[in-house]
Amino acid sequence: MAHLATADANGRPHVVPVCFAHMDGRFCIAIDEKPKRTRRLKRLRNIAENPSVALVFDRYDDDWARLGWVMVQGTAAIISSGSEHERGVDALRERYEQYRSMALEGRPVIRVAVEKVVSWGVFSG
């Protein structure tokens, strides 16, 4: 689980939890069958207006010496078909068993090209 931050053309932020897979040095994020308005999702509208995004992966522990996070900043694209879409769906299904029974082929995948990585805590170093 990670958190995807997008912003609209006016810079208004929007953050949502997402499932992801790493593929070819990029991250793929599914738009799956869980109840939502797939084609009208705020994250998709924001990426169409402003492709700059951030992904945050964090770790919480009651022992605060073991806290940490990684933030990936990059450029997102909405991939709806083709070989890159197929590879993204395959990578997501490999990582998440739940996706194996979902019809992801007709749904877009968000691809995030990594431009900068920042980390803190147990992930820095």
Regions found by a protein language model. Name each.
Residues 36-38, 92:
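Short gly/ser/thr-rich secondary-structure transition/capping motifs
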Residues 1, 50-53, 67, 106-107:
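Short, surface-exposed beta-edge/turn micro-motifs
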Residues 41-44:
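Short amphipathic alpha-helical segments and helix-helix/interface helices
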Residues 38-39, 65:
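Residues that form or flank phosphate/diphosphate-binding pockets in enzymes
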Residues 1-36, 55-58:
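Short beta-strand segments
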Residues 60-125:
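Charged, gly/pro-rich active-site loop segments
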